[in-house]
């Protein structure tokens, strides 16, 4: 199948998402009648007359056919950045977003398909006008390397002296027309895809020492490209139709007009990966990693920026014409953008088919390498330790990442602990967090899970005809019902509350970047085996996308691919085991071999805290007292 036919087929699959109008829901209600104006944000506006965004595969001849670790296109093409517009989970979510809120997809397309958005083909919030090859290229080379710092200063671009004509200060030419129209994103507005791009075909990047410009367009040195602020553009995401109320809740903004401030923190915080980093030790002073788990060939091993971890320094060359001395350098940023997605890029290749996938550079070997990078990133993001405290097993999960763990989109994403106590013969005595691999179901509702539960509530639920607390409707989210994700180093409750990222239904002390869970040790257990699992897409979310979609087949397609690729098979982030002292079991809190008044005193002294929690619910209370009395003697 040709590239044009593949795009047309995919566009037809999702085009019907733009035809829904006031569709009634079970239980009443209708789609919220927003307009395109409700999703207007500052930044460069869609304009079909700007220089076209070229497809990433066109960069392969110089940037993709050599070193599998350093060649930018070779690693980028199998990343979720590259495949963000082909992601079947996103297609299904986009259809439901447009069902729920008219034009809601415009907010999604800004970051998932910026080339199409900038070319004016994302109007209405659907993909029905995605006809050009770069439209499905996701966040491709041209998108990032034409981005402009919206704030002039030391991070502004400087033109290479070899450019003809020489332009030492190219950014004001881009920003001045936007300033005249009141469209330069100000502080707090540089999120939600409110990017500034050069309307001209130029190349901006982080290096000032590129020896030769082989492009037919100007090159500019842009320090902005080495900063996390560039990543903030699409990694702090808010529900644009919401507005913060005086009581701290988020309600429905007035429809038919842009958001009154366009500031992300005045909207519901759907994703806050950048803000989580900004309010951490990483942003303030950096975090050293003597084990070099992050950063690749980084000169110090001190991680400060998003790029330090997600674009690690690599020994090699950024161009196939410079693969030999003296052009090889130690700091080529790897463009794999490793993250937490364990299966979707495989599904993208399957949807395209081998011929079309290979034509866009999505070779099977590159997919396998990308998945391997993601799995290693997950393993590096956490550490886990086990210890015995009397009759309890303590499991500590340490967040080693620069943001919450897990972070990003909350829908369908979770971690959980599987704890299995075994006897001397190897038989399972007790288990928490059991999982059914055949159905993709977490069987234990009381298992320790980490994630965020965001819901639709109050006036948004009423306007959409949904019950309070409805799950997964991403365009309608306006309440954090629970968020027990583990914060990063340097976390403070006050700073996180300012951007809506404070823990909900969980408690972390300032500076705490770990979580402890206590498990009562059952009689007969001689060993405990613990695994921290991560899952990209839960069964509940996959079924929601299938069942809630009344627009097209993208929900069924996403569900079928989810099944085909192992039901988003959970990935082990950490696993460990510990031998259990036989004298320390059950409610024997002081490990003296008997449950008596001494243990009762310990339990009562720990009342309301987790330190004598026998049933694993996180607190010492009457349930634990009942367990102790039942084990008396």
What are these regions (language model features)?
Residues 1-10:
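Bacterial N-terminal signal peptides that target proteins for export
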Residues 9-18:
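Bacterial N-terminal signal peptides
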Residues 23-42, 69-94, 125-512, 517-523, ...:
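Primarily the internal scaffold of c-type cytochrome electron-transfer domains
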Residues 42-61:
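Local sequence-structure signature of Cys/Sec-based thiol-disulfide redox active-site neighborhoods
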Residues 90-107, 117-120:
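N-terminal catalytic scaffold of extracellular/periplasmic and nuclease hydrolases
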Residues 110-122, 126:
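Conserved, well-structured interaction surfaces
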Residues 582-633:
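Cellulosome-associated attachment modules in secreted, modular CAZymes
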């Amino acid at each position: 199948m040709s590239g044009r036919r593949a795009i047309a087929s995919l566009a037809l699959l999702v085009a019907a998402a733009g035809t829904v109008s006031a569709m009634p829901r079970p239980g009443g209600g209708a789609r919220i009648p927003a307009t395109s104006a409700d999703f207007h944000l500052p930044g460069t506006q869609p304009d079909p007359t700007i220089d076209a965004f070229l497809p990433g595969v066109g960069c392969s001849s110089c940037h993709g056919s050599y070193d599998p670790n350093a060649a930018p296109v070779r690693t980028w093409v199998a990343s979720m950045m590259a495949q963000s517009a082909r992601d079947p989970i996103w297609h299904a979510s986009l259809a439901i977003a447009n069902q729920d809120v008219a034009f809601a997809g415009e907010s999604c397309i800004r970051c998932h398909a910026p080339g199409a958005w900038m070319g004016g083909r994302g109007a209405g919030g659907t993909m029905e006008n995605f006809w050009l090859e770069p439209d499905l290229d996701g966040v491709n080379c041209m998108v990032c390397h034409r981005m402009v710092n919206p704030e002039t200063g030391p991070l502004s671009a400087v033109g290479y002296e070899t450019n003809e004509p020489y332009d030492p200060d190219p950014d004001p030419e881009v920003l001045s027309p936007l300033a005249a129209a009141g469209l330069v994103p100000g502080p707090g507005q540089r999120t939600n895809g409110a990017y500034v791009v050069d309307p001209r075909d130029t190349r901006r990047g982080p290096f000032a020492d590129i020896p030769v410009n082989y492009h037919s367009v100007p090159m500019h040195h842009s320090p902005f490209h080495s900063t996390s602020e560039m990543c903030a553009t699409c990694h702090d995401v808010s529900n644009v139709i919401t507005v913060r109320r005086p009581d701290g809740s988020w309600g429905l903004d007035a429809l038919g007009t842009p958001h009154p401030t366009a500031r992300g923190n005045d909207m519901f915080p759907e994703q806050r990966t950048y803000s989580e980093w900004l309010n951490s030790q990483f942003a303030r002073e950096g975090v050293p990693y003597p084990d070099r788990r992050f950063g690749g060939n980084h000169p110090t091993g001190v991680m400060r920026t998003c790029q330090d971890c997600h674009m690690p320094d690599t020994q090699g060359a950024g161009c196939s014409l410079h693969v030999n001395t003296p052009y090889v350098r130690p700091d080529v940023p790897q463009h794999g953008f490793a993250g937490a997605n364990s299966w979707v890029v495989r599904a993208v290749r399957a949807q395209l088919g081998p011929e079309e996938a290979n034509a866009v550079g999505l070779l099977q070997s590159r997919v396998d390498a990308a998945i391997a990078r993601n799995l290693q990133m997950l393993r590096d993001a956490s550490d886990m330790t086990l210890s015995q405290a009397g009759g309890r097993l303590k499991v500590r999960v340490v967040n080693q990442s620069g943001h919450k763990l897990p972070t990003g989109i909350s829908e369908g994403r979770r971690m959980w602990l599987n704890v299995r106590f075994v006897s001397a013969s190897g038989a399972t005595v007790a288990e928490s967090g059991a999982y059914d691999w055949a159905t993709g179901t977490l069987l234990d509702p009381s298992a320790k899970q980490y994630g965020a539960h965001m819901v639709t509530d109050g006036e948004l639920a009423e306007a959409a005809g949904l019950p309070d607390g409805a799950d997964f409707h991403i365009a309608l989210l306006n309440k954090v019902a629970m968020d027990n994700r583990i914060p990063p180093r340097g976390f403070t409750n006050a700073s996180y509350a300012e951007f809506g990222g404070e823990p909900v239904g969980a408690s972390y002390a300032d500076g705490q970047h770990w979580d402890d869970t206590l498990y009562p040790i059952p009689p007969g257990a001689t060993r405990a085996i613990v695994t921290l699992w991560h899952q990209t897409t839960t069964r509940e979310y996959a079924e929601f996308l299938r069942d809630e979609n009344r627009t097209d087949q993208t929900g069924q397609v996403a569900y079928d691919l989810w099944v085909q690729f192992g039901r988003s098979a959970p990935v082990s982030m950490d696993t460990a085991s510990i031998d259990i002292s036989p004298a320390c079991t059950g409610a024997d809190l002081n490990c003296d071999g008997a449950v008596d008044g001494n243990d009762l005193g310990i339990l009562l002294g720990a009342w309301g805290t987790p330190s004598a929690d026998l049933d694993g619910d996180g607190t010492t209370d009457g349930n634990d007292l009942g367990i102790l009395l039942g084990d008396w003697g």
